[in-house]
Amino acid sequence: KAVKQAKKSIHMEYFNFRNDSISALLFDLLAEKAAEGVEVRALYDGFGNCSNDRPLKQHHLDSLHRRGIQIKEFDRLAFPFFQNSFFRDHRKVVVIDGLIAYTGGMNVADYYVVGKPEFGAWRDLHCRIEGDAVAELQ
């Protein structure tokens, strides 16, 4: 709801955006907002992306860029992997118009909504933050 109501900016930082139906819905919404003139920026972790079974590939990123979404990879994995494998960005933060923020443990993936059979039932949370604390997450 808050993303749909954004007027100026949507900034997202996630460990990964899994290439599935949830991220497709989100990216469609973000593209709509970008077309309305909202600044849409997203950051994801290089290891987080390549460690999931449905990573974003270059053609996905190219499509997102064409649709007005500024998406960047943090610390791309490169050989030798051990040089940067522990310097990861595991944050999950969304800031909308500098007024509302969400943070918690959820990445962008179907299984945060429907679960994952091999892990059984679990719950991950995100919290909505308003007021001065939003500036700390911006």
Where would I find each of the regions flagged by the language model?
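HKD-type phospholipase D/PLD-like phosphodiesterase module
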Residues: 1-9, 13-138
